[in-house]
Design a protein with these regions (language model features):
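Short, well-ordered secondary-structure micro-motifs within conserved domains or adaptor modules
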Residues: 233-244
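A conserved amphipathic helix/loop scaffold
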Residues: 242-400
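Hydrophobic targeting/anchoring helices
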Residues: 14, 18-211, 298-300, 311, ...
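Active-site neighborhood of glycoside hydrolase catalytic domains
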Residues: 1-17
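A short, well-structured beta->alpha microelement
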Residues: 24, 213-231
């Protein structure tokens, strides 16, 4: 793709070039073409799944699908947009219902709120022949009649014009909002490595990451998915969920970030392999011992029909996919322990101050994300970072001027 971009620019020097990525984050191509002038993605929300909220949620879609894409694409170059946003009913899903009235407009506002610079749709007119005859456009088969989705595009355009009259180009973002700014460190190769050796059929790498991301969005936190090339010091808090592939250079970068005042959260399966997917000739999981102080006695995997329990602050949480039995140093706090099995009472979650910052290690993956949410709540309280408690599906952004 990068070579194609360079070839186009060779002959069309004044033409900008982008592409409409499908946000399949684990495939590794997003952000891999630095010659693109800006990033863009495609997003369809209603196509037969049932990930929305409530009985009719399938008519709106998963409320984090656009948010996650915004937070993933925006940090790459800053300038980004949506090249394909669903205009209405589509043809290619397993079941293709009508979107709920207002859904298209909601999607457009969600894209804009995340900092997008443009929104396009596919397509303008519903086709008369071909494989996508039943795919809506802005206008219908007569080329004149505006479809329901087209009317919502019309409404959004009017609203955004009105909003411009009331906006300021130099509006200051609230201090409490900026204090919550958090990065999620992401490398698709971690997913490649783990998904090929899951060790537990119930393990899901992206479901694990979402437990942290969903919590951050409920906090009203601005979130960036970033690569290792980014400056960690730009963020008060950095989470590296299940970051399996690592090396000394990366661990040293984490240590420097923490010692200089950063607050790092690492989760289970982190730094267990080197960059080539090999287990180091050293105690298992010891690559991050200089950072966390922990030694790993062993890890356990339970049957889903016979899960285990973790306890933190008197509250119990269910787990089965992955649990690490830790041996923490004297200067670490134990935040959560295992309640049952032959390692009952052993640490599962630790917290340690290092230099001017902190390192939290979460060695277990809970069933529903309740443990992960309470850990982040506990941490942000200790850091005096104010958080919100937004219901699922309600997202907070402070956006640049339209």
């Amino acid at each position: 793709l990068n070579e194609q971009c360079l070839l186009i620019k060779k002959y069309a020097k004044n033409q900008w070039v982008t592409t409409n990525y499908i946000p399949n984050y684990d495939e590794g191509h997003i952000g891999g073409s630095p010659s693109l002038d800006f990033q863009s993605y495609t997003r369809y929300m209603v196509y037969g799944d049932n990930e929305g909220i409530g009985r009719r949620g399938y008519r709106v879609g998963n409320p984090l699908r656009i948010a996650w894409a915004n937070d993933f694409f925006r940090p790459i170059q800053g300038t980004y947009g949506v090249m394909e946003l669903q205009p209405g009913q589509v043809n290619w899903g397993s079941i293709n219902p009508q979107p709920l009235p207002g859904a298209v407009r909601l999607w457009m506002w969600s894209v804009f709120a995340g900092g997008s610079d443009f929104i396009c749709t596919y397509r303008y007119r519903q086709p008369l022949y071909g494989t996508e005859q039943y795919h809506y456009g802005i206008v219908g088969t007569d080329g004149v009649t505006v479809t329901p989705g087209g009317r919502e595009y019309e409404t959004f355009i009017k609203e955004i014009r009105e909003l411009r009259k009331h906006s300021s180009s130099r509006e200051t973002k609230p201090a409490d909002y900026l204090a919550r700014r958090t990065a999620i460190l992401f490398n698709h190769e971690n997913s490649w490595s783990i998904e090929r050796q899951k060790q537990n059929r119930t393990w899901d790498t992206f479901a694990h990451i979402e437990k942290y991301y969903r919590t951050l969005k409920s906090f009203g936190a601005p979130v960036d998915f970033i690569s290792e090339a980014k400056n960690l010091s730009d963020y008060p808090v950095v989470i590296a969920p299940t970051y399996q592939l690592a090396d000394k250079e990366l661990v040293d970068k984490w240590i420097t970030y923490v010692k200089n005042g950063g607050n790092l959260i690492l989760t289970c399966r982190t730094a267990q392999k080197d960059r080539y997917g090999r287990l180091p000739e050293a105690p298992f999981g010891s690559m991050i011992t200089p950072l966390t102080g922990n030694e790993m006695n062993f890890y356990d995997l339970l049957l889903p029909e016979n899960p285990g329990t973790v306890v933190m602050d008197g509250k119990e949480y269910i787990w089965n996919t992955w649990g690490e039995i830790l041996n923490p140093p004297a200067d670490a706090q134990v935040w959560a322990t295992y309640k049952n099995e032959f390692y009952e009472g052993s640490p599962a979650v630790t917290f340690r101050k290092l230099g001017k910052g902190t390192i939290t290690y979460v060695g277990v993956d809970s069933h529903n994300g309740a443990l992960e949410k309470d850990i982040l709540k506990k941490l942000y309280v200790q850091l005096n970072i104010p958080v919100m408690d937004l219901p699922y599906g309600c997202l907070l952004y402070t956006s640049p001027s339209p």
